[in-house]
Amino acid sequence: MILVTTAGKIGAEASRLLAQRGAPVRVLVRNPEKVPALAQAGVDVCRGDLEVSATIDAAMQDVTSVVLVSPAIPRQELNVIASAVRARVQHVVKIMSKASADSPIARRRGQFEIEQGLIASGLGYTLLKNNAYMQNFLMMARAIAETSSFGTATGDGRIGHVDARDIAAVAAAIAASPAAHMGKTYWPTGPEVLSSTDVAAVFSRVLGRTVTFHPITVAQQKQAMLDVGLSGERGRGQCQRRCADGKGRL
């Protein structure tokens, strides 16, 4: 059994791909009724909460591999790692981005704490340190549709955006056959590095009308994250990453 720890854009796709290839797969979610398509695809949808160790332990029964993907809150992911140790899981595929103990970005310090906890656990592991997701632009879809413009705090920073579906496919493949990937770290990225102005040019070409980019302040970026429904903690993390991208710190 392979356990996927959330059903977000990567977790849901990884679960679907594993079920499609006939692998036994379970996904841990707070509200199973919100993911009927996964159950219909043959995924074992298990109710649980990454804050509650007992529910993680229940989901970890008979699991050999874990795809660890979540908003990267250290206490939650360390709960999963501890549960995997108790269940004698063989391998963990950790989805993450950049990690550093002394980063000015809280999310990256948190990622470092999780990474070190996984390495110290004695579990087999693979780290996928992916670049920024292309799908993050969907948060700006309404603004682009209504104003033919979008703003971020990235400035002139250039990023190799990667498709979250590709990350899901890589994670699923490793979780299903982990032997060749034990202890490895991979850095998935997109095929080219693009500034926000470059991205606006792509939107213009595809949509057949002019789309422009305008820089915004850190405060405006933070509010934009909250406006599209991100929690305060996740919104701050995304905002800090955008600002770091703009300063060439990616």
Regions inferred by a protein language model and the residue ranges of each:
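Oxidoreductase cofactor-interface core, primarily capturing Rossmann-like NAD(P)-dependent enzymes
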Residues: M1-Q40, E51-A54, A58-S65, S70-H91, ...
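Conserved SAM-binding strand-loop segment of SAM-dependent methyltransferases
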Residues: D44-R47
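Short alpha-helical scaffolding segments that buttress acidic/His motifs in well-ordered protein cores
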Residues: G237-R242
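NAD(P)-dependent Rossmann-like dehydrogenase/reductase catalytic/cofactor-binding core
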Residues: C243-L250
